[in-house]
């Protein structure tokens, strides 16, 4: 396993640990999710380039599109929550209410 793959896996695991530790603020959780998505994008790009798997060349681009959609929805949710509640604490949300 190359050094680049180990660094990408370490970045993914650090983002996962950050998501598990700093989940009180929505902005911190969104940043950790973006770090995980970026690590997955780099890993899938490196894998398709190293294996010369031409049928999967679109997979990193599709992952990048879904990551952009996730970021847009997350930021819209963050703006809505901060306008409604005044903070971005996840504990202030009651997900059982409509």
UniProtKB/Swiss-Prot annotation:
- What keywords are annotated for this sequence in UniProt? Electron transport, Membrane, Mitochondrion, Mitochondrion inner membrane, NAD, Respiratory chain, Translocase, Transmembrane, Transmembrane helix, Transport, Ubiquinone
Which is one GO molecular function term here? NADH dehydrogenase (ubiquinone) activity
- GO terms for CC? mitochondrial inner membrane; respiratory chain complex I
* One GO term of the biological process aspect: ATP synthesis coupled electron transport
Give the superkingdom in one word: Eukaryota
Q: Which residues cross the membrane?
A: 1-21, 26-46, 61-81
**Reactions performed catalytically:** a ubiquinone + NADH + 5 H(+)(in) = a ubiquinol + NAD(+) + 4 H(+)(out)
Task: List the membrane topology term(s).
Answer: Multi-pass membrane protein
Its Enzyme Commission number(s) read 7.1.1.2
Q: Membrane among the record's keywords?
A: yes
User: Does the UniProt entry include the keyword Protease?
Assistant: no
Checking InterPro entries in the record gives: NADH_UbQ_OxRdtase_chain4L/K, NUOK/Mnh_C1-like
Task: Supply the Gene3D superfamilies for this chain.
Answer: 1.10.287.3510
Which top EC class is given? Answer: translocase
Compartments, record wording: Mitochondrion inner membrane
Subunit info? Core subunit of respiratory chain NADH dehydrogenase (Complex I) which is composed of 45 different subunits.
- What's the family? Belongs to the complex I subunit 4L family.
Q: Tell me, what does this protein do in biology?
A: Core subunit of the mitochondrial membrane respiratory chain NADH dehydrogenase (Complex I) which catalyzes electron transfer from NADH through the respiratory chain, using ubiquinone as an electron acceptor. Part of the enzyme membrane arm which is embedded in the lipid bilayer and involved in proton translocation.
In Swiss-Prot or TrEMBL terms, this protein is called NADH-ubiquinone oxidoreductase chain 4L
Gene name linked to the record: MT-ND4L
């Amino acid at each position: 396993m190359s050094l680049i793959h180990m660094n990408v896996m370490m970045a993914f695991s650090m983002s996962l640990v950050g998501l598990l530790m700093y989940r009180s603020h929505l902005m911190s959780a969104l940043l950790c999710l973006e770090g995980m998505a970026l690590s997955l994008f780099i890993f899938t790009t490196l894998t398709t380039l190293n294996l010369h798997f031409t049928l999967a060349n679109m997979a990193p681009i599709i992952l990048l599109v879904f990551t952009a959609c996730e970021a847009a929805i997350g930021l819209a949710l963050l703006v809505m929550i901060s306008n409604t509640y005044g903070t971005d604490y996840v504990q202030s949300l009651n997900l059982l209410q409509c």
